[in-house]
Amino acid sequence: MSWQISIGSILIAILTSTQACPEPASQPLTATQGDSRPAVDLELVIAVDVSYSMEPDDLAAQREGYAKAIVSQEFLRAVRAGPAGKIALTYFEWSSTSDQKIVVPWRQIDGPGAAEAVATEITNAPIRRGSRTSISSAIKFAASLFEQNPYSGPRRIIDVSGDGPNSNGDPVTSARDTALQQGLVITGLPVMTNATPAAPTDFQHIDHIDWYYEDCVIGGPGSFVVPITNRENFEEAIRTKLALEVAGLTPKQSPAPSTDKEPRVLCTIGEKLWQERWGAITPASNGPAMSKPAASSPSSKEDALLDKKIKGICRGC
């Protein structure tokens, strides 16, 4: 079940719940006994899809949404409400198995000044696009960033955004399960601004990317998704999602993720759709009936041979 409640009502709830919170402790806290790193309330990795399935307007709206969310009143109040009154954040963009680029390295946010600096880093970076969609590699890359974090917090969240299923690299459920075993939480921002395929070449379009994220991508205590259904909704949805993550809140209507239940959307649908387009296999189904493992993704050599062709004709890469 997707989250359909009013984003505005959630923002009001966040503001109300944090207004009565005490000021953060004046002395530095240590998140883990014996850990000498500066303490924060949350370690947050933001993983942003820049594959060719994302329209240029959506890429721009996504960038602007994160930059504005980080300096918003709701986000900063949620930050101040924590025991340490600060969080650590890093922001990277991803597409294929080998394409992850850090836009903002680990930064501490403890007030408007630090937030403005991070927002400026995001907006000043050139907008780019990449081929293929490897959510699994994005999750693995995000998990590795926590080991490089100069700050230490009791909660670690990977915030993944995207508009298509995994079609490259390891199965997304494998990467998800490994991250959950490491104590990480994965939340999702499925982008649904294109409700129908824009062209015959949009071969990786699926009707319910929100279901896919709920059943195949997110996981861990308090994980949730906030779908974006129109371009005008980017800023508000991202602001709400980040404030919820920092405050440690979960929408009441958000599904309780379970890695044991039968998914409503085949978790290997992206790999199957890719093979149908570039290889010869049996047509895929968008439902859970097809439970056989997907054929392996095209090799790196095949990827390279197809790359120019993909960039020219394919939105769903």
Identify the residue ranges that each predicted region occupies.
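C-terminal "exit" segments of structured domains
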Residues: 225-293, 297-298
